A protein has these predicted regions:
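Hydrophobic core of transmembrane alpha-helices in multi-pass small-molecule transporters
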Residues: 104-115, 173-206
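MFS 12-TM fold signature
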Residues: 84-90
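Helix-loop boundary and gating motifs at the non-cytosolic
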Residues: 2-52
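Conserved small/polar residues in nucleotide/adenosyl-binding loops
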Residues: 218-224
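Cytoplasmic membrane-interface "Motif A"-like loop-to-helix N-cap segments
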Residues: 68-83
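Central cavity-lining transmembrane alpha-helices of secondary-active solute carriers
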Residues: 46-64
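Intracellular juxtamembrane helix-capping segments at the cytosolic ends
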Residues: 206-217
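Residue-level signal for conserved functional micro-sites within the alpha-helical transmembrane segments
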Residues: 22, 55, 59, 204
Length: 224
């Protein structure tokens, strides 16, 4: 057997695009959902699992559709091009929605800003919150306002700069609670974000199945 180098490079590039997309998706979307919209880890996980649920139906569907497609551009190319373009445009659109949500959090979003920390404390002082490990706490019972405002995201420990556990365990959940309050007051931004996210997932399904379908059949050719 002789390797079809051109076909192998094209198929490898398709896999590279898919892997790059999912790396960006898996590293970015959960942070937006929890930090900007204030969603819990549980609900963020549900949304992040949608791609696997949709893949069960979408990948076989678009694979079968591309198998039956006939056109001047071939069976796979239109799906690959259209799916990639739509996914790229929708990812850019998601960044604009993210920026719109950030404007709702402008008074509490700054890191290590005393004014932002004061706003967070005033809004969440009496609320019952959860640390990342799931422990409940009431902010006003843990810190006075002055103590809370002095918390910084990083501290010096044994000559090294490390993440402050008080910031991770108490400031971050309090800020996320403020983000959820803002989302509850203006849910349209979250709804629009989820709709765009679904479009991204569907467009990637349009691209993924046709892109990898040829790999089993055409990356090797018999010598003549």
């Amino acid at each position: 057997m002789k390797l079809n180098y051109k076909r192998t490079i094209f198929v490898g590039f398709a896999f590279f695009l898919i892997c790059s997309f999912w790396q960006a998706y898996d590293n970015t979307i959960p942070l937006i959902l929890t930090n900007k919209f204030g969603m819990s880890q549980a609900w963020s996980g549900v949304i992040m699992a949608l791609d696997n649920v949709l893949a069960l139906f979408m990948l076989p569907l678009f694979g079968a559709i591309s198998d039956k497609h006939r056109g001047k551009r071939g069976r796979r190319t239109p799906f690959i091009v259209v799916g990639t373009l739509i996914a790229a445009v929708m990812l850019i659109a998601l960044s604009f929605v993210d920026s719109a949500q950030l404007r709702h959090l402008s008074d509490v979003s700054a890191i290590d800003d005393p004014a932002a920390l004061e706003q967070i404390y005033d809004r969440q002082a009496g609320e019952t919150l959860l640390t990342p490990s799931g422990d409940k706490f009431v902010l006003s019972q843990k810190f006075t306002q002055e103590e809370f405002i002095r918390i910084r995201s990083q501290v010096e420990q044994d000559g090294k700069t490390v993440t402050n556990p008080d910031y991770t365990n108490y400031v971050v959940p309090a800020r996320q609670a403020c983000a959820w309050d803002a989302t509850a007051k203006s849910p349209a931004t979250l709804v629009f974000f989820i709709v765009l996210l679904l479009i991204v997932l569907v467009s990637m399904a349009v691209f993924r199945s046709p892109a990898v379908a040829p790999v089993s059949y055409t990356h090797l050719t018999l010598p003549t």
